[in-house]
Amino acid sequence: PGWQFWNDAPEFARRVYSDIRNLVRRDRNHACVWLWEPILNETWYPDDFAKKTRELVDQEYPYPYCYSGCDSGARGKEYFPVLFTHPSFDGKAWGDPNADPKITYFTREWGDNVDDWSSHNSPSRVARNWGEQPMLIQARHYANPTYTYTCYDALYRTPRQHVGGCLWHSFDHQRGYHPDPFYGGLMDVFRQPKYSYYMFKAQRSPEKQERLFETGPMVYIAHEMTPFSSKDVTVYSNCEEVRLTFMRDGKVSTYSKPLTEAGMPSPVITFPDVYDFQMDKAMSRKKKQEDVLLLAEGLIDGKVVATHEVHPARRPEKLLLWVDNEGVNLKADGSDFVTVVAAVADKNGNIKRL
């Protein structure tokens, strides 16, 4: 219950101890709580303070499956069963070069990659309205960038005592201490998805299950088919095979997922040199705009189980409105509210992004 601040006055530690007790009492019966971080986050505190915080958690939650953690380089780390660090499996990534195979490790937060802590420029921080190229870079950065950095693929290549990590952060939000919002979310502040959302969605199992949330196979084309779009087409999918078609009855490209035991379940798929705006222009001049498309088909056991089709947005002619309620209806109690999303679209409903 604190961040980057320590005071040597005894009263400060006593108040923190009280906060820790109240924190555990408040949340100890929540089924989603797996691990406690009772220490002051990113703070240079004394050794005896760390020992006391661990003891307080154990007192308030005296059960065998009570786990507490702190940073692997912090004072008093020897008192904690879980240590926070970044993967260091290859000796290059930012992590603990002296990782002990007898200790459980966890990456408390990963993903951010700022140039400095004043400017806050980062390939992870991308506003949704910046368009497809920045969003593609963000998704690639989170998945498996060309440079050495903690990413989803790296977390899948750790020894088994490194049990995972948490992305920073799920949604864009205001922070208060910087003029820019934090743009590192998989969705924007209005919970509208960026490409990174679909990249992570592709990591789920393709098996269809009876659950309260969406399951099963998926495929998504991260390409807007604009005059500024890349010739390379990026696709996210959890299927065994993806078939991409450019133009109706046109060129077909095929991707087969590699059979590997290491790394992220569904790597980012790139179909090189597929899209050509000049072909779009040629077909449009022939009044054949309906034949200009990208069609992705996800296959499992040779059968198509998921599809996604993208068309270029033409002349803007209407507004689309939809309720973003995730299937939960409004309750007329005077306090409920819901998000209504508005979009500019052509006559066929293709949203005009640029």
Question: Which positions does each model-derived feature cover?
Answer:
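Short, solvent-exposed loop/linker segments at the N-terminal edge
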Residues: 223-229, 327-338
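Aromatic sugar-binding surface patches on proteins
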Residues: 261-282
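Non-catalytic, glycine-rich low-complexity segments
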Residues: 169, 181-234, 238-239, 310, ...
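Substrate-binding/catalytic cleft of secreted carbohydrate-active enzymes
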Residues: 1-196, 213-223
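Short, aromatic- and glycine-rich surface loops/edge beta-strands on solvent-exposed regions
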Residues: 285-302, 342
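Beta-strand-rich binding/interaction modules
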Residues: 230-256, 293-298, 354
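Beta-strand-rich structural segments
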Residues: 235-237, 336-353
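Edge beta-strands of extracellular beta-sandwich domains
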Residues: 302-314
